[in-house]
């Protein structure tokens, strides 16, 4: 083990996945999923995922359906999710929070916001785990 926290980036756009990895830098280990089905497969295979960056609109299974699977298996109790979308629709934002996301990130990405949101969510979940 390299000691780096593992982040699953689930987005059907290879460019968006690469951009997020470039913004976040070498301090993390990354897993990539191009659709929701692959995201669920990776969640089953890797029990040490620290964070999921999850796009809403993906083929085969969208981000909302991934969240439903995560709730079904109680993975949301252990793994925080930051939902990603270009949509400004508040209904999607509310639905994401209702399904259990820790935070919501809009595209286009702002470098400082991406870094801070990821750091804050990881820090808060680490503190929560220490308290339980």
Give the positions of each predicted feature.
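Two-component/phosphorelay signaling modules centered on CheY-like receiver
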Residues: 2, 6, 13-32, 44
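C-terminal output helix
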Residues: 91, 109-118, 122
């Amino acid at each position: 083990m390299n000691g780096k926290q593992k982040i699953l980036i689930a987005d059907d756009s290879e460019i968006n996945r690469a951009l997020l990895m470039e913004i976040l830098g070498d301090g993390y280990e990354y897993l990539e999923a191009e659709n929701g089905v692959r995201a669920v497969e990776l969640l089953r295979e890797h029990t040490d995922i620290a964070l999921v960056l999850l796009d809403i609109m993906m083929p085969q299974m969208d981000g909302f359906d991934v969240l439903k699977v995560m709730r079904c298996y109680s993975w949301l109790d252990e793994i925080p999710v930051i939902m990603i979308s270009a949509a400004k629709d508040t209904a999607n934002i509310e639905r994401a929070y209702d399904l259990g996301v820790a935070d919501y990130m809009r595209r286009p990405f702002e470098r400082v916001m991406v870094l801070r949101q990821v750091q804050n969510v990881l820090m808060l979940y680490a503190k929560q785990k220490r308290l339980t």
